[in-house]
Amino acid sequence: MPPIKVKNAGKSVPARRKSAAPAKAQTRIQREKQDVILEAALDVFSLHGFRGATIDQIAEQAGMSKPNLLYYFPRKEEIHKRLMKTMLDTWLQPLREFDAEGDPIPEIRSYIRRKLEMARDFPRESRLFANEMLQGAPRLIDILEGELKDLVDEKAAVLLAWMDEGKIARTDPYHLIFSIWATTQHYADFDVQVRAVLGPDRGGEGRFEDAARFLEALFLNGLRPNSR
């Protein structure tokens, strides 16, 4: 590409390109403010979804003015994008840790446990994800068809290899993964229903341990190679 020229005392000389200024590191206060906003946004988005949530609601939940919030996040989409990226990184970590070199039954048991722990510890994130799915995942479809699909394909291949080696019973690995997602995330997405039906005697924190024992029996008994 030829150099850009500017006029200077009747002569054309190459213009010097300005180098981009280095991004300034965030201060501790800026990071703390962003964390407050993201925490408030998680509450609002998990209740109302992306479309129903407003900047005003998030600012009110964060206890700050709307102009102050917009200084850190100029658009609602930026807040949502940051939340979804953090959530997906956390959400997919247990599946990433699914070890092809491990013993199949303990690996699957550990995965079920981790997913239930996440349903217990991150219910708002789970509901945020469910809301996004119900809206057709317009802001997540690239990740679902890319990073998520690649990861599930990889772990489905691990499950198929275990089946071929006779270590677990043969079944559809994709629907096995979907079923683990559905049954574990139910305890976050439908938490109110679960507690209402179980009642005060069984609807406390112990419900997650009860669920873990049930789901382990449901999945692992069916996957043991001599179970069919």
Region roles according to the model:
Residues 1-21, 114-117, 121, 149, ...:
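C-terminal peripheral helix-coil segments that are non-catalytic and often amphipathic
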Residues 33, 76, 83, 87, ...:
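Hydrophobic/aromatic residues within well-ordered alpha-helical segments
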Residues 36, 44-78, 82:
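Helix-turn-helix
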Residues 81-110, 152-161:
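Amphipathic alpha-helical linker/stalk segments
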Residues 96-125, 173-180, 209-212:
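Hydrophobic alpha-helical connector segments
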